[in-house]
Amino acid sequence: MKIGIITAMSSEHDQVALLLENKKEYTEGIYSYTEGQIHNNTIILTQCGIGKVNAAAGAVELIRNFQPDCIISTGVAGGIDKCLKVMDVVASSHIVYHDVWCGEGNAYGQIQGLPTYFEGHPILLNCAMSIHTGTPIHNGLICSGDKFITDRKELNEIKGNFPEGLAVDMESGSIAQICYLYKVPFISFRIISDTPGAENHWEQYTNFWGEMANRSFGVT
């Protein structure tokens, strides 16, 4: 199976790249790709950049250049539910934009003409939830938007609109939309690096990268 993996940041990309065997490097246009093997699967890893537009462009180019059988978006996310702790993982049962409003006749979070929620592929979700590690894996809603969520007011607004939301990030929604349009099976697999609204929020985030990241990305 050929699996595309998209990360936003170099810190995320480098953690996943460490897990690949027999690596080869490619450049196509503005994007660089690392091809390698994990458990007899061919992995195509790319870094798209932060935010929805970068993520969408990266997903399109990955599909166009390599025709993967499925795509995984991975990286860090903020936990917005009390059930989550730093280093827990959220696998997307569904994904929504938390910063989209197309006016009357559309649900909040819905781009007109598209589903409000983009569903994680059921086979990929089942695979994710069947992993046996010491890391808690939760399946649920990931909320995406073009803002790094830092304070309680922002968190409460997102939870008010999407009470079932577990995590927030800046890329999963747009990659899910591209995969929906191109009919490529997709799932987002996000490691919780921080909990927005916590008094020590920034300390959580920096501690994750300083002490925990190299123990987290192997779950992906």
Question: Language model features by range: what are they?
Answer:
Residues 1-66:
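N-terminal short beta-loop-beta anion/metal-coordinating cradle
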Residues 67-72:
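Proline-aspartate-enriched helix->loop->beta-strand connector
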